[in-house]
Amino acid sequence: MRLKVSEVKTATDPKQWAVFERQECIHAHIAEHGMVNPIVVNSDHELQFGGCRLQYAVFAGWEYIDVIICDDPQEIRRLQDEHSGYEYSFLPEHLIERRQLN
């Protein structure tokens, strides 16, 4: 599904988010290869994850962005793990964020 970038709800403006080395790598990958994975929002269009991708779309002036709409927390976590796995395939090791598994 596609959604207007302006319809994605976040607590703060993505233009104000910090851009660190990790975000720069993800932005460069999107610029070279396109956006491979959509962002995930809930049914109220609130961003669940994919902030670096949303930030790239905002900076690039995209009008629309591919989204997955999901309200199930378990499915959101599964999607996040899947999408993170893809990012890990191209990010340098020192930029990979490790999460403690419960």
Model feature map: region roles:
Residues 1-71, 75-91:
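Short, charged/polar connector segments at secondary-structure boundaries
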Residues 87-102:
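Alpha-helical interaction elements
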